Amino acid sequence: MLDLSLIMLGAGNSTRFGLQSKKQWLRTGDDPLWLYATKNISSNYLFKDVIVVSNECEYMRKFSSHFKFIKGGETRQDSLRNAISNINSEFVMVSDIARADIPKELITKLIESAHNADCIVPALKISDSVIYQNEYINRDELKLIQTPQLSRTNMLKKALKTDNIFTDDSSAIKAIGGTVWYIEGDERAKKLTYKDDLKRLNLNSPSNDIFCGNGFDVHAFKEGDFITLCGVKIPYSKAFIAHSDGDVALHALCDALLGAASAPDIGELYPDNDSKFKDIDSKILLQNSVNLIRSIGFDIINADITIIAQSPKISPYKDAMAKIVADILGIPLHKVNIKATTTEHLGFIGRNEGIAANAIVNLKYFNWRNVL
């Protein structure tokens, strides 16, 4: 049996993909694509180690305890270098999470060919005519290189000890004099690069699950002349004691969004001991939170916010608040509700020592089929 480990690369930003969600976070059923792709390959062989490379490692750990997670780098090569330093098996198979439909037959052919060269590479023949700088070139001399590629670990480690940039493992190994063996590739292993590529993948639609999140925040008062709630400045004889602008309503909303997605909370993402968040406009924090949950495959359904304050009166500002929130969340105005209540002069809120807010949000998976 081959002493073999698996590395799945998925630290890219999906800049060419053209959808709100990173491709690795598109859902097929309840699984994000990175998990689906990793399980698809790892189920076909008893790999010594399975390493997933990502920029969302802590979040990914919630989805599986069977894999190791390594932080990605600036480039594919940096990410691979980070991962392979944790590999001690004789051979390593490297694939891209963007190749989600790798067939079992291709994995088998790679493993059977492992001893033929330093790197085993699936490649497709080109059937169309090819032109380069207005000159037709012989397509029979060209190949489309795919992953996964299977390499001798020591050779790949050696090949990565360079500042030269390579787009795949085989070219790096070839550059140091290593040998490469080509096997027949598979159309099903083509890379998911643009959103239209989704049409050829045999993937289930996202599940119809709904995810509810709840957020709560409170801030005490100090002397001042206004407070900010849901992005609206309200004239008042006090101000919030806070590291940011103290917008309790938007802070609660941020936590509700993050909680529904089971993501890190507002204190972890925007700590109050970080100077870059000093006096920050909380609308920026909310926009960052929205961008995050969308990038990991969620859509926002609705938001319901309750502001708990003895004073000032909130009613005159509710419409302006709702519009700001709806614009940032990217949902219709009728799906945002702002409410206000008092504590009937009870407790610290009743004594006008501060204000609290509670927010509830519902999310669903981004349905990529609707944009094809």
UniProtKB/Swiss-Prot annotation:
Pfam families: IspD, YgbB. GO terms for biological process: isopentenyl diphosphate biosynthetic process, methylerythritol 4-phosphate pathway; terpenoid biosynthetic process. The keyword Metal-binding applies. Residues 1-210 are annotated as: 2-C-methyl-D-erythritol 4-phosphate cytidylyltransferase. A divalent metal cation binds at residues 217, 219, 251. The keyword Nucleotidyltransferase applies. The record marks 16, 23, 243, 342 as: Transition state stabilizer. It catalyses: 2-C-methyl-D-erythritol 4-phosphate + CTP + H(+) = 4-CDP-2-C-methyl-D-erythritol + diphosphate; 4-CDP-2-C-methyl-D-erythritol 2-phosphate = 2-C-methyl-D-erythritol 2,4-cyclic diphosphate + CMP. InterPro entries: IspD, IspD/F, IspD/TarI, MECDP_synthase, MECDP_synthase_CS, MECDP_synthase_sf, Nucleotide-diphossugar_trans. Keywords: Isoprene biosynthesis, Lyase, Metal-binding, Multifunctional enzyme, Nucleotidyltransferase, Transferase. Pathway: Isoprenoid biosynthesis; isopentenyl diphosphate biosynthesis via DXP pathway; isopentenyl diphosphate from 1-deoxy-D-xylulose 5-phosphate: step 2/6; Isoprenoid biosynthesis; isopentenyl diphosphate biosynthesis via DXP pathway; isopentenyl diphosphate from 1-deoxy-D-xylulose 5-phosphate: step 4/6. GO terms for molecular function: 2-C-methyl-D-erythritol 2,4-cyclodiphosphate synthase activity; 2-C-methyl-D-erythritol 4-phosphate cytidylyltransferase activity; metal ion binding. Its EC number is 2.7.7.60, 4.6.1.12. The record marks 139, 191 as: Positions MEP for the nucleophilic attack. Bifunctional enzyme that catalyzes the formation of 4-diphosphocytidyl-2-C-methyl-D-erythritol from CTP and 2-C-methyl-D-erythritol 4-phosphate (MEP) (IspD), and catalyzes the conversion of 4-diphosphocytidyl-2-C-methyl-D-erythritol 2-phosphate (CDP-ME2P) to 2-C-methyl-D-erythritol 2,4-cyclodiphosphate (ME-CPP) with a corresponding release of cytidine 5-monophosphate (CMP) (IspF). In the N-terminal section; belongs to the IspD/TarI cytidylyltransferase family. IspD subfamily. In the C-terminal section; belongs to the IspF family. HAMAP family: IspDF, IspF. This is Bifunctional enzyme IspD/IspF.
